[in-house]
Amino acid sequence: FEKLGVTVLSISVDSPFVHKIWNDHELSKMINKDIPFPMLSDQGGKIGTMYGVYNEEAGTETRGRFIIDPDGVIQAFEVLTPPVGWNVSEALRQIKAYQLVRETKGKNVTPSGWQPGKKVLTPGIGLVGNIWKEWSVKEAFDD
């Protein structure tokens, strides 16, 4: 994420103490260094409420991932219930796609299944009714 110039924040309703215990007794056994981004506490769920992931009745937050552009606009979000983890590779792919679109000022867009280095589309009247000439459904799937 750092190589892409992306700031990652982890936010949960857990206290800083719980975050430390999780880092020291769980995460430290999975990676050989400290977590590479801040873990912030949202006790009371104010931030989670703003993003629609806080359950006030249970006092918990559903796992959510939000891609926010440099202008503060949410470009993508994914909300998953606890039994299913999110895909880091997919998050990176989406960030690269949004960065490409931003860098080209929308002159290029990424089709379904796009991967870095693969063909992009140029939106416009000429593409209408002709996407099939530029892109195939099989490109939406991993090899």
PLM regions and their residue ranges:
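Chalcogenol-based redox active-site neighborhoods
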Residues: 1-143
